[in-house]
């Protein structure tokens, strides 16, 4: 179906809450420590990502919306790393620095796609003067379409009731991802987004969907909420509003690798969609699709517009289909963290025929993901002559992306995809025809990275050139 995404570029959202830095240490394990019965991890990769409220802001910015972030940090390396990472993804930060406290940091050690341990460095910000936070909210209210209060129970939202009142007085919707079981703190909010366990911690165990609805509607009435969205993991999510029938949305996740930060993605997409002028029902639709994408990634992650569009078209994953080069690199990185083997091939694919389909199916069988790099129209013309391509690039890529064997499609402008291949570095590079492996563009780079290069045979009797000739002959006849 044709999907029209919200106009995220005109959406302004402020996020206020508990910001933190997520650190990831990756490496192989091959032995047990002689000091204790624990694995020894040889760390070879270190990553730092914004977490908590900062991850919410990143999710908003990744959609192309204007994201502002307010929170409490220390004056330390973690705060500086947070600021730099967020500036790099167009999040405008306005942190309140507290010299007596460290920036909240969570360190995770992973090996073989498993998290071995998490170490938390924090003291919490309870008792810190909230007035600087209130001032920042007041200054922004005239230029934002939604306020997100991201509560991780670390102290930044100690004065959450005053924050809600400031926004409601200005007519700005307030969305809250709650951590406290004392929902009195959130009285008057526009929307609360508890997950099922958080919801049941307040209302008690719910055995049926009807109980969720009944108790949820009572919460709305008791705490003067405008709406309640209960995220229910593999059961999807349920939107409850006074005077309206419940809206239950099934999950769109196809593969679940990590639920870290999924709630951040949900509330981020909700806020950006509402701030863009869409209805709450539409916002929930897009948020549900985004959640299905992000749980297929490892660690706190964001969703790009093309991933979201692919997801609402029913292809939720790491972003199937046509991609830009940068989006492809992110998708490949996510696949590698899951231990998947990436195969790559390239060609013009002007008039797709049975030989192409058979070749691509065979290439896909050699790994877990298949990338098809396609010559641009200008590149094709230089390679094949002025009469080619018959089909423009966009149409060629759409057809390729619809094939079951193909995961990702990307274009390149040069005569060969050598630069593109060098940037992706697939585990296996394949090419059809009578080439020698060393003649294939990108082979040297793939070999140098420890990858493989393989030549596959095309199906006999299938040729785009022959198809074009036959069409021309039929026209003459």
Swiss-Prot record:
GO terms for molecular function: ATP binding; heptose 7-phosphate kinase activity; heptose-1-phosphate adenylyltransferase activity; phosphotransferase activity, alcohol group as acceptor. Residues 1-318 are annotated as: Ribokinase. Keywords: Acetylation, ATP-binding, Carbohydrate metabolism, Kinase, Multifunctional enzyme, Nucleotide-binding, Nucleotidyltransferase, Transferase. InterPro entries: Bifunc_HldE, Carboh/pur_kinase_PfkB_CS, Cyt_trans-like, PfkB_dom, RfaE_dom_I, RfaE_dom_II, Ribokinase-like, Rossmann-like_a/b/a_fold. It catalyses: D-glycero-beta-D-manno-heptose 7-phosphate + ATP = D-glycero-beta-D-manno-heptose 1,7-bisphosphate + ADP + H(+); D-glycero-beta-D-manno-heptose 1-phosphate + ATP + H(+) = ADP-D-glycero-beta-D-manno-heptose + diphosphate. The modification N6-acetyllysine is found at residue 179. SUPFAM superfamilies: Nucleotidylyl transferase, Ribokinase-like. It is an enzyme of class 2 (transferase). It comes from the Bacteria. One of its GO terms (cellular component) is cytosol. Its EC number is 2.7.1.167, 2.7.7.70. Pathway: Nucleotide-sugar biosynthesis; ADP-L-glycero-beta-D-manno-heptose biosynthesis; ADP-L-glycero-beta-D-manno-heptose from D-glycero-beta-D-manno-heptose 7-phosphate: step 1/4; Nucleotide-sugar biosynthesis; ADP-L-glycero-beta-D-manno-heptose biosynthesis; ADP-L-glycero-beta-D-manno-heptose from D-glycero-beta-D-manno-heptose 7-phosphate: step 3/4. In the N-terminal section; belongs to the carbohydrate kinase PfkB family. Catalyzes the ADP transfer from ATP to D-glycero-beta-D-manno-heptose 1-phosphate, yielding ADP-D-glycero-beta-D-manno-heptose. This is Bifunctional protein HldE. It comes from Escherichia coli O9:H4 (strain HS).
